A protein has these predicted regions:
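N-terminal secretory signal peptides that target proteins for export/translocation
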Residues: 1-2
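Residue-level signal for mature regions of secreted extracellular proteins and peptides
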Residues: 11-12, 133, 186
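C-terminal motif of bacterial Sec signal peptides marking the signal peptidase cleavage site
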Residues: 16-17
Length: 307
């Protein structure tokens, strides 16, 4: 049921911020207010947090509003990782961050600082928790369908996240709506305190998802570049259409093996593409759009569909 709720939310919750609904407000030290709404049924209650302002202010509002959940979720995630595998040591996580730092959007860095201050949690620990997916091997799945492939012609973008449930991240779901002073408003479904993005959508109708493909035998990975989860946050701020999103992927220095699913839900430019990032000898990027059927692969075997 939780997965179904999150899927539906990605379609419509963005519009909550455009109308007045009942909820709670939390005013921070700068006078900026985070609005909190809830979607719930008999078994599940998910907070929808609307933040606004600069990246630091939005991070602070989010951290202050979800303080208890951030501490339990992110510190628990880090603790489990470090207890279960020595590769999640402080040294390894710090090394990944340091190598990627030249490529990380300063807006993400500032939001992370604000999140740590608002939630009153160690910035170092919060940063290390964000590096766990970067140095991990995992696989997910996704699909985008539109036009003749759907009953009503609308675009539907589906994303499945294959994280371990032992970390109990699923116990702390949160929907965050960002209304930045500069940049495109956007939304992401995540876990309390995790502000990198594995799926999200911006107000221009651009939707993001991925499938991991880096096997554990290739560990340790090369971190001299940008991880998709941080690149997605930049794209949410700046990508206004499918072409601009793909251009940002092409210009980025990418790391590891991934399938990146990007779709555009606007009627006039509706469509999707899959970007395939392959390593480790060298980073190779291949981008396929609808109706392109690469020889020898099973990609894009149906019209108006990428998966």
């Amino acid at each position: 049921m939780l997965k179904r709720i999150l899927t539906l939310l990605l379609v419509f919750v963005f519009f909550i911020s455009c109308s007045e609904r009942e909820g709670t407000s939390t005013e921070n030290h700068d006078g900026k207010t985070a609005k909190v709404f809830y979607v719930e049924n008999s078994t599940t209650k998910i907070p929808v947090v609307v933040v606004s302002g600069t990246p630091y202010e939005m991070g602070f509002q989010l951290g202050e509003t979800t303080k208890d959940e951030v501490n339990k979720c992110m510190l628990g995630f880090l603790e489990l990782g470090q207890q279960s595998d020595e590769k999640y040591s402080d040294a390894n996580l710090d090394d990944a961050w340091d190598k990627m730092l030249p490529y990380i959007d300063n807006r993400f860095i500032e939001e992370l600082k604000g999140l740590a201050d608002g939630a009153e949690v160690s910035l170092d620990k919060l940063r290390r928790a964000h590096m766990i997916p970067v140095i991990s091997s995992f696989a997910c799945s996704g699909v985008a369908v539109w036009g003749d492939a759907t009953a009503n012609g609308d675009l539907y973008h589906i994303r499945n996240l294959d994280f371990t449930m032992d970390a109990h991240l699923q116990d702390f779901p949160v929907i965050v709506i960002y209304k930045p002073d500069q940049g495109i408003p956007h939304i992401q479904t995540s876990f309390a305190g995790y502000i990198a993005s594995h799926s999200g959508m911006n107000a221009k109708g651009i939707v993001f998802g991925e499938k991991g493909a880096s096997p554990s035998k290739e560990y340790p990975y090369n971190y001299d570049g940008i991880h998709f989860s941080l690149l997605f946050r930049t794209m949410m701020y700046d990508a206004s259409n499918l072409e601009s999103a793909l251009d940002m992927i092409e210009r980025a220095k990418l790391i590891k093996r991934y399938y990146l699913y990007i779709s555009d839900g606007k009627k006039e430019t509706m469509g999707a593409a899959i970007a395939i990032v392959t390593t480790p000898d060298e980073v190779k990027l291949s981008i396929y759009k609808d109706n392109e059927k690469p020889e020898g692969t099973s990609l894009n075997v149906m019209d108006n569909c990428v998966y």
